[in-house]
């Protein structure tokens, strides 16, 4: 919460839900909370970049310890995976990341992912965990990405949750209210930005809450939050990586003939 206290009931619920999902899904958990729980140990915390890095370094082991505690009754080991933006922008590093996660899944280990705030380059940081989760989902060719939010879903102008969105268009974008979480960096604008990216690459996205007893199961059956339908995509894995994980370093201008050849995949 805003005072830096981790809600054990939420962690317990997340662990229980994921334990059930593992029967049919390979799961990656991207978890916030490190900075929020670690800032209690930073005197006169003001939220500067250096203080956030220090708070994350203190909070990450606390968070992992709790996940270990609540996954333990299900005999499920967890792994801490601290990522940086270059792990996705570098194709070779990304492929190594995929191999490691494949090893996790083969051994029934749940990877718990967060940004490596302590050493992350300021210019190449993730904008927030919404971006990190989206890059994970796209890079690992996920079927579904569930993004949790305190408001329980994507709301219209009357603060009513919209249960189904077929496409993120100008009408949907018009409902976005600016503002960020008091605990993290992301807000609904960020969530919708990365939802649009994920759905454009063929991934179903659900923005939902954690208030029900079985929030993930409810989300997957359309009973919790807002479901954003995936758009048709014929892109191969490398093309999806180029569309999401790679970083633009420059531009090339081509003439009409070259453009036609590229569009025809020649």
Which functions belong to the PLM regions below?
Residues 1-77, 81-266:
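C-terminal catalytic "cap/lid" subdomain
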